[in-house]
Amino acid sequence: MELTKSEREIMDVLWEAGVPLSRSDFLERSEAKTWKDSSVHILLNSLLRKGMIKEAGLVKCSKTFGRTFLPTMSREVYYVTAAFAHRYPPAFLLVMKALLDRPEADKATLQQIQKLLNEKMK
């Protein structure tokens, strides 16, 4: 998944926080940035569409409620995936095959992987 510089900066704030954040939390935690509220809103919606973040709940923000967000993957997983996908598009399948061909991939491990795949396919 290709992210813009601003989207990566939003993700960095979220990854460093380690807790669900609201739009106003992003503004507070990004003091070095001069993002406008509307810019953060646009970036969060873009990250939602790309599947990088998910809604985690609601919090009361003054008189209204605001959504909170969590990342759908760790920073490490994002950068490894992005590096493979960018340079070697079929690399994901090759990596999976290499991992599955290892002797450590016993039947119990393969069953767990199958369960994860089945859940993902729903």
Task: Tell where the protein language model's regions lie, with residue ranges.
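A short, conserved structural fragment
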Residues: 48-60
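Short, cationic-aromatic polyanion-contact patches
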Residues: 4, 58-80
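Basic amphipathic alpha-helical segments that dock to polyanions
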Residues: 10, 41-50
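Short alpha-helical segments that sit at the start of domains
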Residues: 1-13, 17, 74-75, 85-89, ...
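Short acidic, hydrophobic short linear motifs in intrinsically disordered regions
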Residues: 20-30
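Amphipathic alpha-helical dimerization/coiled-coil segments
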Residues: 76-122
